[in-house]
């Protein structure tokens, strides 16, 4: 499992002109799932993200988690994170999980994040989405389970 995490001042996701998910501040996640991922991977990533200390304390050091600052999470499914661009000029997505399996694991992942005590908004799995955010910092990390 691969997640691109962005600390966000605000974020939203729109499908067909309608906002389907929106957070005031917290973390925006682009979530990629490969066919080798399991529920164990999803749980690991959910716990890691909830507890990563990437928000500043009073002295400006990254000492607080999204839980500590009472932030929220906007989670977007993103199969293109497993695009392989090493050959040719068109990405190969063979490493991305098949849609049925990916949707199950994506839903499971979001529930695991909620179990950590976070409010989670989502996009619409498999839809063409417009994602808007104000990246705070910017702080952008890639979190992987393997």
From Swiss-Prot:
Top-level EC class: hydrolase
Instruction: Please give the function described in this protein's UniProt entry.
Output: An aminoacyl-tRNA editing enzyme that deacylates mischarged D-aminoacyl-tRNAs. Also deacylates mischarged glycyl-tRNA(Ala), protecting cells against glycine mischarging by AlaRS. Acts via tRNA-based rather than protein-based catalysis; rejects L-amino acids rather than detecting D-amino acids in the active site. By recycling D-aminoacyl-tRNA to D-amino acids and free tRNA molecules, this enzyme counteracts the toxicity associated with the formation of D-aminoacyl-tRNA entities in vivo and helps enforce protein L-homochirality.
Q: Which InterPro entries match?
A: Daa-tRNA_deacyls_DTD, DTD-like_sf
Q: Which coarse location class applies to the principal site listed for this UniProt protein?
A: cytoplasm
Q: Which family, according to the similarity comment?
A: Belongs to the DTD family.
Q: Does the keyword tRNA-binding apply?
A: yes
The name this protein goes by in its record: D-aminoacyl-tRNA deacylase
Q: What taxonomic lineage is listed for the species of origin?
A: Bacteria, Bacillati, Bacillota, Bacilli, Bacillales
Q: What positions carry the motif Gly-cisPro motif, important for rejection of L-amino acids?
A: 137-138
